[in-house]
């Protein structure tokens, strides 16, 4: 049940996007500004994610997909990669209880084969603990790359055609969507209404290229660890000033 404050905020904001995607960028620069190592920024970003998730849940957002680690991030320094891979363990250990209390359901997209065993175990434990929750879906994009996702979908479709499970004429946009990693999401909420990128960068970086065809984009110079409740509300207010046409006049 929403509190009076949450209801009032929703009324002021107007329409709430059902699916928000966030490219969480700027952790390293945030740490550098404070003369700290990059990993310090990643840890602060973990706390920002918890606050944004709870806020989105209170507002009635259905899906929050966060770009936690891309397939390209493996090229970063090994000590940083190792730290980032341990972040889900720390995040779930610290925040799963409060997320569970708020009816948040944890899911993920991405290739799991390269994930360390303890990272995968923590992720699976969080997914299992929250699997019966019916509130916001916190969808981690972990070792995710949009082009790789589409390539994998094409391979599976081609194999099903070869196996006579599909005819080429059966291939539609909806069918392709069913082969993507987001097929586990509720059908009406698979594609983000709003994609937010922090830190001032103006690109998608291989994040949900298929699903974002008609998304609205919000770019902010705010670094991710500083992106808290007020910044999310500002992004949603900006979203509400736009008219979504989906290619129409």
Swiss-Prot record:
Its cofactor is Mg(2+). Keywords: Magnesium, Metal-binding, Transferase. GO terms for molecular function: ditrans,polycis-undecaprenyl-diphosphate synthase [(2E,6E)-farnesyl-diphosphate specific] activity; magnesium ion binding; manganese ion binding. Its EC number is 2.5.1.-. It comes from the Bacteria. It is an enzyme of class 2 (transferase). Mg(2+) binds at residues 25, 216. Gene3D superfamilies: Decaprenyl diphosphate synthase-like. GO terms for cellular component: cytosol. The active site is at residues 25, 73. This is Isoprenyl transferase. It comes from Streptococcus pyogenes serotype M6 (strain ATCC BAA-946 / MGAS10394). The gene is uppS.
């Amino acid at each position: 049940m929403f509190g009076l404050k949450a209801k009032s905020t929703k009324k002021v904001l107007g329409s709430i996007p059902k699916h928000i995607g966030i490219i969480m960028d700027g952790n390293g620069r945030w740490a550098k500004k404070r003369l700290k190592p990059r990993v310090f920024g990643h840890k602060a970003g973990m706390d920002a994610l918890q606050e944004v998730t709870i806020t989105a849940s209170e507002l009635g957002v259905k899906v929050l997909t966060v770009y936690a680690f891309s397939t390209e991030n493996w090229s970063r320094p090994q000590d940083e990669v190792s730290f980032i891979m341990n972040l889900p363990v720390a995040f779930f250990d610290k925040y799963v209880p409060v997320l569970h209390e708020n009816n948040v359901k944890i899911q993920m997209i991405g290739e799991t084969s390269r994930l360390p065993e303890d990272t995968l175990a923590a992720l699976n434990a969080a997914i299992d603990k929250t699997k019966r929750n019916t509130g916001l879906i916190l969808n981690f994009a972990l070792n995710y790359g949009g082009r790789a996702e589409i390539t994998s979908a094409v391979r599976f479709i081609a194999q099903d055609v070869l196996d006579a499970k599909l005819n080429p004429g059966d291939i539609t946009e909806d069918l392709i969507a069913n082969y993507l990693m987001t097929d586990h999401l509720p059908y009406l909420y698979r594609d983000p209404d709003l994609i937010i990128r922090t830190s001032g960068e103006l690109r998608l970086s291989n994040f949900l290229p298929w699903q974002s065809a008609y998304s609205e984009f919000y770019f902010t110079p705010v670094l991710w660890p500083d992106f808290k409740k007020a910044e999310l509300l500002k992004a949603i207010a900006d979203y509400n000033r736009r008219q979504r046409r989906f290619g129409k006049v």
